[in-house]
């Protein structure tokens, strides 16, 4: 047996290695890391167990429950120590529980083999050699402890023997317990009782302490008795036990503050508390026993042999107190020493030997295994062999580890403190405490489990969150990348677009700057086929025109040469024969003619001196002058010879001009050699190059530009002709004269298109006088003018050129016939006539070969197929022609072509080519949208290039800066109540309400259907009294006797008249004179009544005014101090060619469809010579058809601006100015700056006032007018209101519908009397017959004869059936005409209209009309996707139109279309939308309306059947009562029936339907039957 001094057997203090695997060697076949079951070193602490197998009390205290419970309880205590919460208030009780010895129910201790196999340390001492391995000096039979040294609740002290007196007295122990209890209560925060305070101070013991002392004394006495008995039995062992008792007692005193356990004695409130803060780690796990290692065999053998006799092992610490008492009793009863059992050391050694033998045998078996084993078995065998070979190494390693641990341990109890703990009695309170702690532990475990689960769920949620965040970040990155890519593409596209725009701007810049080469290069770079095609066609067309112009000039020159030769030959023959000179018509010149007063050029035969002009003799005095001046003779050159020389010298001039051009190119402007004349030429050339965009330099081939070819011969005109007197031409008029002279020199014709008022008449007279003086072209000149301007032309000729002989060809046929001899004699220069007489008297006027034909207001020739153009082209010979017009392009480009074709038919041949080239940007069918700005400019410039040589146009603002400004205002006018009602009915139904007098229903009201609705609407806007029956009915209503309304009711019925009533008095007060233009003569009559009511002096000029009276009217109005305030003119008759510059205010009462008519009318006042600012007031009714007319007029003016004005054919505008003007038109063409507001008095005054003083005066006049109206007791509003209207005009919609149906019924089925006869408005006579009838004076008789012949011829044709079959066999080519449907019965139409009106007018509870969006569909342009989805679009407007055109034959057809409309809405719109729901409601409304009408029909049919039955019964009764029958022949019956039918037409029977398909034969048959019927009567 090893002593405590032996270092190998001495227990060393140190940390417990815990319940880990045993460090002993592996003694089994398994080479794994688990503990060996037979290892001596497998336990680190003492293993308590039975001292002997045969001991009767060895199994006492065993119970059937596992020992892991205590280890599980120790585990959380370790966590408490680790977390540092030992100082917690509730920690003490848990510590006590953890340090308590095992419960009796913890079960029996396991065997050493099981302990080794499980791999954890047991807290009990080993049964294999208790005397050797347990280092307790107390013998097994001794009492557990001495009474003096016993501390209640101390498990170690209970197992200690009594080694002498205790160091503490009982009083000190009582005071110590009281102090511990007080400390515990203070730690819990509880108050200390007085008894406890006295006990702490040692003044008094706690109650129950005395009983405890007595028990302790009894226990001490018992222990002394036991010690005496043991001393007698075991005296040799006593010194050793005493030697060990002292260190153990000291160890107990050292470990006493570290124990946390308490015992509850029988006394109340007594507790023993020991603080465990000093060594928590050592108490938290079982400590090893510190048993010496069995490795050194020398130490083991003495230990085994030193045990004398049987030894009794002390009871396990977990045994309860009854077991101890029983053990004490047995030791007292049987003190005999028990026999010694088997030596466990030898058994252990034998077991070791056998295990080693088995291991060696197994190693040999594994080494001798064959090599042909499968791989898996071989692997297992190899692993097992290597494990067995490692056994000794593992054993050595474990010994070294244990040796090291033994050195670190000083006290045996430090390794396993629980081995010496005294077993304590378990009280009920401790059991409850244990149960409570167990519940807390379970709750804590559940909390931890839930917390762990919550953490798990949180980790899942966090993972999901991270997952989402990750993918969101990935998606964000992808989105950013996509955005970056899209941005890159957008930037690239933007840059490309900018580059494209830059190239387009550069191209436009070069196009505008006339850099043709650069422009073509850019076109080639872009490879725009469309622009290249336009350029190519432009070049081809212009080149073609250039060739045509050149050919035309050559042809004219050749003709002129032939004529000159012929004339020269005749002149020579006449000179030889002494015949008088011939006139322009080939006849000899009469002395009384104008030609006799012209100077004749003569030359001196010797000197060659030529006399011409005033110095030359006149033609009438030529012979006498030659006799008086010998040596002179008539110069051989006549006017024809002069023109011949011009044409012969044309080529020479061209060559010289080319040489001059070359010289100009060689000249250096900066050199000193350049003369002043050359410098001027250079400047002029530069100006021309800048101004004329078409004058190009000669190309390499020397060809000239289009304009240069056209105006090859140029002549400078610096002053007007001497024949032009009483005035001087302005500079721009001289330029116009020069341009016309250039046309004459180049054998071309043109259009003088100066704006109205710039003096086209004066320039024409100047051209005639210039040609007469300088070109010897005395005429005859044919000037064709409108009838309204004929007197003005005569006046201007008398004023400017009185020496020119003129004939005004007009008047009655007798007057015109009286002028024929003068025409034939040629004793005149100019013939003035009108368009009508040119056509009527062409057999007279066309015989004269006119030198010049001048057509004023040339836009009359705009229609190529009009009669005037055809007559002039076919009958009249005039090689030189000029058109005068202020509006060269009024509506369409073909009109412009018609003018050019009339002037130059050889150049402008095909209208289709011209229109195809230039009509694209102006077509109203959408072609204009397809052209971009550049293509539009190209096409317009191409048209300008074509027009420039033949058209000259200047505007007033350009040529006459002194001309006062012209300001135009569009004034919106309101309607009166009468106008509004009439307008609404006319617009919606096409009817005009009447009082019913035309149908003998006077006062009940009626309706009158009128054709040409737009014209009727314009009449209503102007004045409702333009309808005579309305005026008569209102006259009767207002009490006027003669059926004509006068006075204030005239202006109260019309909004425009009311506006005039406010404006005209102000203009008269400020001495402004007014031109008032109207479209309708009946309106002018109403206007005259109004002027008479207001006492305005006026003049009237319209189409009925005679030509003689017109000049007198103009003279009256224009004379200074004229008393006439207003000139009332019709737009068509008085808007052309009149000079009315005395007026400074123009009122356009109603606009014309052609805006140029209104412009012409405005320029009657805004002319050269006007001194005042001109105000143009255009009246327009709000929300009426007049606004549409104004919009159409604006579009036409837009076309004119693009073509004519942007060309700026004024010969001096630069290309930059023309480009800027055209660009401004294109940019602002869609702006609309009008408002629909009716202006108030202040706004009106601002419009018509020229100065501030006038504005103030007008405001005062308005104030006075309002005051006067307020003073009038019978005052009425300025415009008529609804309460003033008669009852027959205020009808509800149902009544108006009824009247409309009646009117339609009469219109379709007739009045029932007879069929309407056709009226032939065509001319019955041919022109020859008409002229002959005029001459004979029997015009009416001739017309009647022709009509009778036509009627007979038609009857003969009707009787011929063969012709009828031939006509039927003939078919028109192309698509057959659309058949007109036969009309429906009025009742069905009425029902359909009633149903549709019910559906359309249906409103919901909120008052919203559901059918508003269904009335008219949006256009394809606004909503293209609707028409892609819906195959058959339909709306209520189309349905009503089909009802009107009788497309529906039954209500079922109507229902199909309405259902289709609703179905379309439901297909296109989403389910649940408002339109979708409205369509469902409208379906139900339609069905209910149809059912209602069906019920009404059934009730009507039933009532009709009842009436018919009653009629049949009456007729039967009448037939029975009649006894006498009168027989008549069939003719009499037929005649009587016809007479009855005429007297009382039967509306119940079917009436003949008049349709467009009735042939003429059927109509005549009906007429004949009617005629025979009337004859029989």
Curated annotation (Swiss-Prot):
- Describe the task this protein carries out: ATPase involved in transcriptional activation and repression of select genes by chromatin remodeling (alteration of DNA-nucleosome topology). Component of SWI/SNF chromatin remodeling complexes that carry out key enzymatic activities, changing chromatin structure by altering DNA-histone contacts within a nucleosome in an ATP-dependent manner. Binds DNA non-specifically. Belongs to the neural progenitors-specific chromatin remodeling complex (npBAF complex) and the neuron-specific chromatin remodeling complex (nBAF complex).
Ranges of Pro residues composition bias in the record: 10-36, 101-111, 137-146
Q: What class of enzyme is it?
A: hydrolase
PROSITE patterns attached here? BROMODOMAIN_1 (PS00633), BROMODOMAIN_2 (PS50014), HELICASE_ATP_BIND_1 (PS51192), HELICASE_CTER (PS51194), HSA (PS51204), QLQ (PS51666)
The protein depicted here goes by the name SWI/SNF-related matrix-associated actin-dependent regulator of chromatin subfamily A member 2
Q: Which GO terms describe its molecular function?
A: ATP binding; DNA binding; helicase activity; histone binding; hydrolase activity
Residues that hold ATP according to the record: 754-761
Which organism encodes this protein?
Mus musculus (Mouse)
Q: Where is the composition biased (Basic and acidic residues)?
A: 656-666, 1357-1368, 1529-1540
Question: Per UniProt, which keywords does this protein have?
Answer: Acetylation, Activator, Bromodomain, DNA-binding, Hydrolase, Isopeptide bond, Neurogenesis, Nucleus, Phosphoprotein, Transcription, Transcription regulation, Ubl conjugation
Sorted alphabetically, which InterPro entries does this protein's record hold? BRK_domain, BRK_sf, Bromodomain, Bromodomain-like_sf, Bromodomain_CS, Gln-Leu-Gln_QLQ, Helicase_ATP-bd, Helicase_C-like
Task: Please state every residue range assigned to the domain named HSA.
Answer: 441-513
Q: Does the keyword Hydrolase apply?
A: yes
The annotated phenotype of a deletion mutant is: Impaired social interaction and prepulse inhibition.
Highest taxon of source:
Eukaryota
Task: Write out the tissue specificity statement of the associated record.
Answer: Expressed in the cortex and the hippocampus. Expressed in the cortical plate in the embryo.
Query: Where in the sequence does UniProt note compositional bias of the Basic residues kind?
Result: 560-569, 1541-1550
Q: Which family does it belong to?
A: Belongs to the SNF2/RAD54 helicase family.
Q: Which residues form the Helicase ATP-binding domain?
A: 741-906
């Amino acid at each position: 047996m090893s002593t405590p001094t032996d270092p190998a057997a001495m227990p060393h203090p140190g940390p417990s290695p815990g319940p880990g695997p045993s460090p002993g060697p592996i003694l089994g076949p398994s080479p794994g890391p688990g503990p060996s079951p037979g290892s001596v070193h497998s336990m680190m602490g003492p293993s308590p167990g039975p001292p002997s197998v045969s001991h009767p009390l060895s199994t006492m205290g065993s119970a059937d429950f596992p020992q892991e419970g205590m280890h599980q309880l120790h585990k959380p205590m370790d966590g408490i120590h680790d977390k540092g919460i030992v100082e917690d208030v509730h920690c003490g009780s848990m510590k006590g529980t953890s340090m308590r010895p095992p419960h009796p129910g913890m079960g029996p201790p396991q065997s050493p083999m099981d302990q080794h196999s499980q791999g954890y340390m047991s807290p009990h001492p080993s049964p294999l050699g208790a005397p050797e391995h347990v280092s307790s000096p107390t013998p097994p039979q001794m009492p557990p402890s001495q009474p003096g040294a016993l501390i209640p609740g101390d498990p170690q002290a209970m197992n200690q023997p009594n080694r002498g007196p205790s160091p503490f007295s009982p009083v000190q122990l009582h005071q110590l317990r009281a102090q511990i209890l007080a400390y515990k209560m203070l730690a819990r925060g509880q108050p200390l009782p007085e008894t406890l305070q006295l006990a702490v101070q040692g003044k008094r013991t706690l109650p129950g302490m005395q009983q405890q002392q007595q028990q302790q004394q009894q226990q001490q006495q018992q222990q002394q008795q036991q010690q005496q008995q043991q001393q007698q039995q075991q005296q040799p062992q006593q010194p050793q036990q005493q030697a060990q008792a002292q260190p153990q007692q000291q160890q107990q005193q050292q470990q006493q503050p570290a124990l946390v356990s308490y015992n509850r004695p029988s006394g109340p409130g007594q507790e023993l508390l020991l603080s465990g803060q000093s060594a928590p780690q050592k108490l938290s796990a079982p400590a090893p026993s510190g048993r010496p290692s069995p490795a050194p065999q020398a130490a083991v053998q003495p230990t085994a042999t030193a045990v004398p006799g049987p030894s009794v092992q002390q009871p396990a610490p977990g045994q309860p107190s009854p077991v101890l008492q029983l053990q004490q009793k047995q030791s007292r009863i049987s003190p005999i020493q028990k026999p010694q059992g088997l030596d466990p050391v030898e058994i252990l050694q034998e077991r070791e030997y056998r295990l080693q033998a088995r291991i060696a045998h197994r190693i040999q078996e594994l080494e001798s295994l064959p090599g042909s084993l499968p791989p898996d078995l071989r692997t297992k065998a190899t692993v097992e062999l290597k494990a067995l070979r490692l056994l000794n190494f593992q054993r050595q390693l474990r010994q070294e580890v244990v040796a090291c641990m033994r050195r670190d341990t000083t006290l045996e109890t430090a390794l396993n403190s629980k081995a010496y703990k005294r077993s304590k009695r378990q009280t009920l309170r401790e059991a409850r405490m244990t149960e409570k702690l167990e519940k807390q532990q379970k709750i804590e475990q559940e909390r931890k489990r839930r917390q762990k689960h919550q953490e798990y769920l949180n980790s899942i949620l966090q993972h999901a969150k991270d997952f989402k965040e990750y993918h969101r970040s990935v998606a964000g990155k992808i989105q950013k990348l996509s955005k970056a890519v899209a941005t890159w593409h957008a930037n690239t596209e933007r840059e490309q677009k900018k580059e494209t725009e830059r190239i387009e701007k550069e191209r436009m810049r070069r196009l505008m700057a006339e850099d043709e080469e650069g422009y073509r290069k850019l076109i080639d770079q872009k490879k725009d086929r469309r622009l290249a095609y336009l350029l190519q066609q432009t070049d081809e067309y212009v080149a073609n025109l250039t060739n045509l112009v050149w050919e035309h000039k050559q042809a004219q020159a050749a003709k002129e040469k032939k004529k000159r030769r012929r004339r020269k030959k005749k002149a020579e023959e006449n000179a030889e024969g002494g015949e008088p000179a011939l006139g322009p018509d080939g006849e000899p010149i009469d002395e009384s003619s104008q030609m006799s007063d012209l100077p004749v050029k003569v030359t001196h035969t010797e000197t060659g001196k030529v006399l011409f002009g005033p110095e030359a003799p006149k033609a009438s005095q030529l012979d006498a002058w030659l006799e008086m001046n010998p040596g002179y003779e008539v110069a051989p050159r006549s006017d024809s010879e002069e023109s011949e020389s011009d044409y012969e010298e044309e080529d020479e001039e061209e060559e010289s001009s080319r040489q001059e051009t070359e010289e100009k190119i060689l000249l250096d402007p900066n050199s000193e050699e350049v003369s002043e004349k050359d410098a001027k030429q250079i400047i002029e050339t530069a100006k021309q190059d800048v101004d004329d965009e078409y004058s190009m330099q000669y190309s390499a081939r020397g060809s000239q530009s289009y304009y240069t070819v056209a105006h090859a011969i140029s002549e400078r005109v610096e002053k007007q002709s001497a024949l032009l007197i009483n005035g001087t031409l302005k500079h721009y008029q001289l330029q116009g004269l020069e341009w016309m002279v250039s046309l004459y020199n180049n054998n071309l014709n043109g259009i003088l298109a100066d704006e109205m008022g710039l003096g086209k008449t004066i320039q024409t007279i100047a051209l005639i006088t210039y040609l007469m003086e300088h070109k010897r072209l005395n005429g005859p000149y044919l000037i064709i003018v409108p009838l309204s301007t004929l007197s003005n032309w005569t006046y201007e000729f008398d004023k400017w050129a009185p020496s020119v002989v003129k004939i005004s060809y007009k008047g009655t046929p007798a007057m015109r016939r009286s002028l024929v001899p003068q025409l034939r004699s040629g004793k005149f220069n100019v013939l003035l006539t009108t368009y009508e007489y040119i056509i009527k008297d062409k057999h007279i006027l066309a015989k004269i070969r006119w030198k010049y034909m001048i057509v004023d207001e040339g836009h009359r020739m705009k229609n190529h197929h009009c009669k005037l153009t055809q007559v002039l082209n076919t009958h009249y010979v005039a090689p030189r022609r000029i058109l005068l017009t202020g509006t060269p392009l009024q509506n369409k480009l073909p009109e412009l072509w018609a003018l050019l074709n009339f002037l130059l038919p050889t150049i402008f041949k095909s209208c289709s080519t011209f229109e195809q080239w230039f009509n694209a940007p102006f077509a109203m069918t959408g072609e204009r949208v397809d052209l971009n700005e550049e293509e539009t400019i190209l096409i317009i410039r191409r048209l300008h290039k074509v027009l420039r040589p033949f058209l000259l146009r200047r505007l007033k603002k350009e040529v006459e800066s002194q001309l006062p400004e012209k300001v135009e205002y569009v004034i919106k006018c309101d309607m009166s109540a009468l106008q509004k009602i009439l307008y609404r009915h006319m617009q919606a139904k096409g009817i005009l309400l009447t009082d019913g007098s035309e149908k003998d229903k006077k006062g009940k009201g009626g309706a009158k259907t009128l054709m040409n609705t737009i014209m009727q609407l314009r009449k209503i806007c102007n004045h409702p009294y333009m309808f005579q029956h309305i005026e008569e009915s209102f006259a009767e209503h207002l009490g006027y006797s003669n059926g004509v309304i006068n006075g204030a009711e005239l202006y109260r019925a019309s909004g425009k008249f009311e506006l005039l009533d406010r404006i005209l008095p102000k203009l008269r007060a400020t001495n402004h004179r007014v031109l008032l233009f109207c479209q309708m003569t009946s309106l002018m009559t109403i206007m005259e009544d109004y002027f008479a009511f207001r006492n305005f002096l006026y003049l009237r000029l319209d189409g009925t005014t005679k030509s003689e009276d017109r000049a007198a009217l103009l003279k009256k109005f224009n004379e200074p101090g004229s008393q006439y305030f207003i000139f009332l003119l019709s737009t068509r008759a008085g808007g052309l060619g009149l000079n009315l510059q005395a007026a400074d205010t123009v009122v356009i009462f109603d606009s014309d469809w052609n805006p140029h008519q209104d412009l012409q009318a405005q320029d009657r006042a805004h002319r050269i010579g006007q001194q005042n600012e001109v105000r143009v007031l255009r009246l327009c009714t709000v929300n009426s058809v007049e606004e549409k007319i104004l919009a159409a007029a604006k579009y036409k003016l837009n076309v004119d601006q693009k073509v004519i004005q942007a060309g700026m054919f004024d010969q001096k505008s630069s290309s930059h100015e023309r480009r800027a003007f055209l660009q401004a038109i294109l940019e602002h063409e869609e702006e609309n700056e009008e408002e629909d507001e009716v202006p108030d008095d202040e706004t009106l005054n601002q419009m018509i006032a020229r100065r501030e003083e006038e504005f103030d005066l007008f405001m005062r006049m308005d104030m006075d007018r309002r005051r006067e109206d307020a003073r009038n007791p019978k005052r009425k509003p300025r415009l008529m209101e609804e309460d003033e209207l008669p009852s027959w005009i205020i009808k509800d919609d149902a009544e108006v519908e009824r009247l409309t149906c009646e009117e339609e019924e009469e219109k379709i089925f007739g009045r029932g009397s007879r069929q309407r006869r056709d009226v032939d408005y065509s001319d019955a006579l041919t022109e020859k017959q008409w002229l002959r009838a005029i001459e004979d004076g029997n015009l009416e008789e001739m017309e009647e004869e022709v009509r009778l012949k036509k009627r007979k011829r038609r009857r003969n044709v009707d009787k011929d059936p063969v012709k009828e079959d031939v006509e039927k066999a003939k078919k028109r080519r192309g698509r057959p005409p659309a058949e007109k449907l036969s009309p429906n019965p009025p009742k069905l139409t009425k029902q359909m209209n009633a149903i549709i009106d019910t559906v359309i007018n249906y409103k919901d509870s909120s008052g919203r009309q559901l059918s508003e969006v269904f009335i008219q569909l949006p256009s394809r342009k606004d909503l293209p996707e609707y028409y892609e989805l819906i195959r058959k679009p339909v709306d209520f407007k189309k349905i009503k139109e089909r009802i009107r055109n009788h497309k529906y034959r039954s209500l079922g057809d109507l229902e199909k279309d309405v259902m289709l409309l609703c179905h379309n809405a439901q297909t296109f719109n989403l389910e649940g939308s408002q339109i979708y729901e409205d369509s469902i409601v409208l379906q139900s409304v339609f069905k209910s309306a149809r059912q209602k009408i069906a019920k009404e029909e059934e009730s009507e049919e039933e009532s009709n059947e009842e009436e018919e039955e009653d009629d049949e019964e009456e007729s039967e009764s009448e037939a029975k009562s009649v006894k006498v029958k009168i027989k008549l022949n069939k003719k009499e019956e037929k005649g009587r029936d016809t007479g009855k039918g005429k007297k009382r037409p039967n509306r119940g029977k079917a009436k003949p339907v008049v349709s467009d398909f009735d042939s003429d034969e059927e109509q005549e048959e009906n007429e004949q039957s009617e005629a025979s019927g009337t004859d029989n009567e």
